[in-house]
Design a protein with these regions (language model features):
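Entry beta-strands of beta-propeller and related beta-repeat scaffolds
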Residues: 1-2, 55-67, 112-116, 159-166, ...
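Surface-exposed extracellular loop regions of Gram-negative outer-membrane beta-barrel proteins
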Residues: 122-131, 138
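A short loop-to-beta-strand structural motif that recurs across blades of beta-propeller domains
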Residues: 17-19, 65, 77-80, 124-126, ...
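Conserved Ser/Thr-centered positions that define the repeating blades of beta-propeller domains
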Residues: 23, 82-83, 127-130, 177-178
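Short glycine/acidic-enriched loop and turn motifs that connect beta-strands
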Residues: 7-11, 70-74, 123-124, 220-223
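Beta-rich accessory regions
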Residues: 180-196, 205-308
């Protein structure tokens, strides 16, 4: 399932709804009907969704629960739930559940048998706990992040006996540390794990194969098209040891190989020679893996078909 903010009536910002798409392979997606529409509390801003395996909220075992920000005269956090696999949602009669702030990311913290919410404030990420998704208790804060927080655990170098927690925000800055269900204690960072058009990326919890999969918002205008902006290709996150210490890596999911149609390899070439080779490759899309040596003091910009 993929839920996303959008305006179904025009290609300009405003009138935010939650759209819904589903996929069996993360490559091919089917758009379904919108699931959240504006109401008296405001338009539908960002949030997250969980599966309530233990029926903690009382809406049924395995109910799908959306936790979202309503943007009215003030920002509030709200709940909606689905008992038909996300096809339709009912908004909780007790909304709002929390006052100001926005962008709630919620997940189940098994060691303490409770829900955790990471919520953006004007200059920090606030951590809340709940037993039932409806009543939340403030626990701590992490300063220095802006919008759309994420918080999750990853093994270092694939070692399940050595795990660290990662906290990041919309722009891709992150810290590595420890988390006890209520307090995040940073050990390393802040670092930056991506550049380009990605913003406000979210990850999936409890994937069947244990991967930490991420989908981001691509801030790319498309003049003349019947849409504005896009969702980016899914990526897998991992923690790896480098010469500078443990860092967060972001790579396209392995399923991308199913989309490949032709392969080209070249090496030991200058930038000018690579450009000449690329002229003979006629395709609208290219998946490139490059190892580039850059002289000190210089930078590298990559263009394909006139686009950076």
């Amino acid at each position: 399932h993929l839920f996303y903010q959008h305006n179904p009536y025009e290609v300009e910002w405003e009138n935010m709804h939650w759209g819904h798409a589903v996929s069996r392979d993360l490559l091919h997606w089917k758009e379904l009907n919108d699931v959240l529409q504006p109401d008296t509390l405001g338009t539908m801003f960002s949030g997250s969704a969980v599966i309530d395996r233990n029926n903690t909220a009382g809406w049924g075992q395995d109910a799908m629960v959306a936790i979202y920000t309503a943007a009215g005269k003030k920002m509030t956090q709200n709940l909606a739930y689905s008992t038909d696999n996300g096809r339709t949602f009912s908004k909780y009669s007790g909304n709002p559940i929390l006052g100001p702030d926005r962008d709630p990311k919620v997940f189940w913290y098994a060691p303490a048998q409770r829900w955790v919410m990471a919520l953006y404030n004007e200059n920090y990420i606030a951590i809340y706990n709940s037993r039932d998704l409806k009543r939340w208790e403030y626990k701590s804060r992490v300063k220095g992040f802006f919008e759309c927080p994420e918080l999750f655990e990853l093994p270092v170098d694939g070692n399940a006996q050595n795990k660290k927690w990662v906290i990041y925000a919309a722009s891709g800055t992150y810290m590595i540390g420890r988390f006890n269900g209520s307090v995040f204690t940073p050990e390393k960072g802040k670092y930056h794990y991506h550049t380009g058009v990605q913003y406000a990326a979210q990850t999936y919890n409890n994937t069947p194969d244990g991967r930490r999969l991420q989908i981001g918002w691509g801030r790319v205008a498309a003049p003349g098209m019947p849409f504005n902006q896009l969702m980016l290709f899914p990526t897998e996150l991992s923690l790896r040891t480098t010469t500078e210490g443990v860092r967060l890596f972001c790579n396209p999911i392995s399923e991308i190989r199913q989309l490949h149609r032709a392969h080209y390899s070249m090496g030991g070439l200058s930038v000018q020679e690579v450009n000449e080779k690329l002229k003979s490759i006629k395709t609208p899309l290219i998946h490139a893996i490059m190892d580039v040596e850059i002289d000190k003091g210089l930078g590298l910009e990559i263009f394909y078909q006139g686009k950076i």
